[in-house]
Amino acid sequence: MTQKVHNASYAAFALFAIGILPAFSQGTIANSYIQHNLVSDIAGMADFTDSHLVNPWGISESASSPFWISNQGSATATVYNGSGVASATVASVPNGATKQSLTGPTGQVQNSSTGFLLSNGKAASFIFATQDGTISAWNGGTAAGIMVDNSPAGAVYTGLALNAAGPTLYAANFHSGKIDVFDTNFHATTASGGFTDPNLPSGYAPYNIWNLGGKLYVTYALQNSNKNQPVSAAGNGLVDVFDTNGNLLQRLVSNGPLNAPWGVAIAPAGFGAFGGALLVGNFADGTINAFNLTTGSSLGALQTQTGTPIVIPGLWALVFGNGKSGGDPNTLYFTAGIQGQLHGLLGSIAPPAAVTSLSNGASAGAATAIAPGEVVLVNGGTIGPSPSVSGTIPTSGSMATTLSTTTVTFNGTPAPILFASASQTGVVVPYEIAGSSTASVVVSYRGQTAAAFSIPVAASAPGLFTSAETGSGEVVAFNQDGSLNSTSNPAARGSVAVLFATGDGMEDPSGQDGVVNNYIIRAPVLPVSATIGGQTAQVLFAGSAPGLLAGVLQVEVVVPTAASTGAQPVVLTIGSASSSQQSATIVLK
C-alpha cells in the first residue's frame, strides 16, 4: 500500500506544488516605474531580437492569448508572450489597390464575436487597419485578407476599435477627420451619434480609438497640411469619450501635456501611484501621462526611479497584460517606432519589485511565521516573469535556486524555486534559517532587488495540501488501497489514509535544501498528531515523502472509527502549531 501511495503522490504533488498560482499583487505608492525592453529589431537593445518588429503600432490580445503586434514598417503582424518570446506565427498585411505614401498596419483588434466572417466561412480572429486606407482580417495562414479598401478615397486609418456586442468596427480616419463605422459584414454604416464633438478645434482629427470598459476613447491630434501626419507641439492633443453609438459622453482631456496622443489604457489598482488612472501615451514626445478617469485632471507623467519622466521615442500602444500568455495584468506593455520609426521596440513598464506577504504553500493562508523547509508562496509585484515559469523537480541533485532570473534568499541563503511569476513565486524555505528569530526575505528579478521583507521564524508552521490548491476543500489524501480520496471515493473508517503537508520544521536526519527525498526517511523532530472530524487519528508514520521534494511531509493515519461519515475536517498539529484550515476535509464512509 505504501509504495502505491508514494507513486500516486508524485503526480498529485506535481499538479499542486508546482501549479499553485493564485493571483496576488500590490503596487507601491510612489511614482516610480521601471522600463524593460523585451523585443527589438536591433540586436542587443532588448531580451530578444526580431527583424519583423519595425515601427510596431497596435497591440491586441484575447483573454488568454499572447500579444499580437502590428508592424507598420514590415507590413506584418507578429506574436509574443508577456516575456517577449516570439511565436512562429507571422502574418503579412497587404496594401490597398491605390498604394499611398504611407502603408502598413497601424491599429488592430482581436475579434471575440461570431461576426466578421472571412472567405473560409469563419470569423476573423484579428483585424488590422492600415495607413493606406484598408482594413484586413486574419483567422489563419500566413497572410491577412483585405476586407475594406478605401485607399482610392485617400483614407488614412490610424486606429481601430471593436464593439463585440454589435458587433461593430470603428476606424479612426485621420485624413477625413472622421470615425468610419463598419457592420459585422465589413459594410460601411453609421453610428447614430456620429462621433461629433461640437467644440473640437479646427484641424484636429481622430488619431486613435480604443474600447475600454465599453466606452470608446478617441484621441485627437492636430493634422499637418497633407492631413496624414500629426503636428508635434506641447498641448496638441485631446481625448473624448463616446458611447458605442457615437454619442459624446465627455471631453475628458484638453491639451495640457498631450502631444499627438495615441496609446490609451486604464491602469489597474496594482499599478503603483497611478492605479485606477487613465494613461495616455504621446507619440510625439514619448511620455506617458496619467489623468483622473472621471474628471480628466492631470496626475503627472510616469517617472523613472530617479524622478525623471519615462521617455520612449515613437511611442504607440499601451496595454496591460491579460494574466495569461499575454503578460502580467499589473504591468504596462508598450510598442514604439524608435529611431524615427525606422526600428521597433516592444517593452514593459512596471512598479519596482516588492514583496508584500508570504503564504503557506499548502494552506494558502497568510503566514505570520515560517518554518525551516516549509513550502511558501512569496507574494508581491514585479517579482518574476509573465507568463509564469515552472521549475523541474530533479531526479537527482537539487532544485534550482534561480528560475527565469528570479532568485529568493532567506537570511542570505538561496531558496529552491518551484515556480516564478510576476505576482507570486513558490519556494522552499532553506533549513539554514533554523535558530534565527526572524528571516529577511529578498527577491531579485531582472537585476532588480526588492526591499527585504522580514518575517518571524517558528519551529513549525503546518499546512495541509488540498486538491483545489486553495487550502480548503478536500485534502490531497490517499485511501488504503492507494486511490485518491474524493466524494465519490471515500475512505472507510478504521482504514489507513495518507495526507501530505508542509511546515514541519527541522527533521532528523537534517533536511537538505532542494533535494528529492530518497530512501533516507527524515522524521520531524517535533511530535506530530492529527484529528479527523474532531476525533484523534492515530499517526502511524510522519516523515519525508519518498520521491517528492524536501519540505513535503507524508503523514499516515488511522481514520478514527468514531468519526462521522461524509466530508470531515482534518487538523494536523506539529509541536505547538496546528494547521488553520477550517474547511480542509477528508471524505469518509
Language-model region placement:
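Bacterial N-terminal signal peptides that target proteins for export
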Residues: 1-13
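Bacterial N-terminal signal peptides
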Residues: 10-23
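Glycine-rich phosphate-binding loop at the start of an alpha helix
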Residues: 312
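Amide-donor transfer/coupling interface in amidating biosynthetic enzymes
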Residues: 307-309
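A sequence-level detector for low-complexity, Ser/Thr- and acidic-rich stretches
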Residues: 26-292, 297-304, 317-323, 327-334, ...
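Prokaryotic Sec-type signal peptides and long signal-anchor helices
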Residues: 17-20, 199, 338
